[in-house]
Amino acid sequence: MPAPGVHHPNTASPFLKTVAAGKGQVAAAPEHPAPSARARGSHLRPRRCSCSSWLDKECVYFCHLDIIWVNTPGQTAPYGLGNPPRRRRRSLPKRCECSSGGDPACATFCHRRPWAEAVVVPGSRSPADVFQAGRTWTSAGELLRQLRNISAAKIRFPRRPQEAGRQLRPTHPRRRKR
């Protein structure tokens, strides 16, 4: 019997014999092909578009179809989202990009201007006509002039019929204290 730690050249473990026997052979193909690294690492979720910002909750809710929204004390948190590569997220100039070019609802949502960018000007046209015409005020002077016109129009008209007939009280009391 050999001393402990010393191996006899003719004795090898069954594992080493198996590895040595299969060294020059090609392994048989398994019945089911191995899943790709991408399929193993992540769950592909159905989505109609990719948002350029995860902070845009309306976009995330619209684009990602299988998100579970959970109400938390400070905010509504989407669960089921992974972190997309930051480079792709920053490179998108629009609100989102549609997965399918044939989805008109997605195209309308992703490529429309936000309501905050639209400036409605009082005049003969309705606000809907002004918005659809795509008019924006590019110069600060033009915007300031329009805001002054709105302010002047509000001053000319009384706010409510009741307020127009009511007299205002003086700010000081009528009787003097002795």
Curated annotation (Swiss-Prot):
The keyword Disulfide bond applies. Endothelins are endothelium-derived vasoconstrictor peptides. The record marks 69-70 as: Cleavage. Residues 25-46, 70-178 form a propeptide. Residues 169-178 have a biased composition (Basic residues). InterPro entries: Endothelin, Endothelin_toxin_CS, Endothln-like_toxin. Belongs to the endothelin/sarafotoxin family. Keywords: Cleavage on pair of basic residues, Disulfide bond, Secreted, Signal, Vasoactive, Vasoconstrictor. It is found in: Secreted. GO terms for molecular function: endothelin B receptor binding; hormone activity. It holds the Pfam family Endothelin. Residues 1-24 form the signal peptide. GO terms for biological process: intracellular calcium ion homeostasis; positive regulation of smooth muscle contraction; regulation of systemic arterial blood pressure by endothelin; regulation of vasoconstriction; vein smooth muscle contraction. GO terms for cellular component: extracellular space. Disulfide bonds join 49-63, 51-59. Residues 156-178 are annotated as: Disordered. Residues 96-111 are annotated as: Endothelin-like. This is Endothelin-2. The keyword Disulfide bond applies.
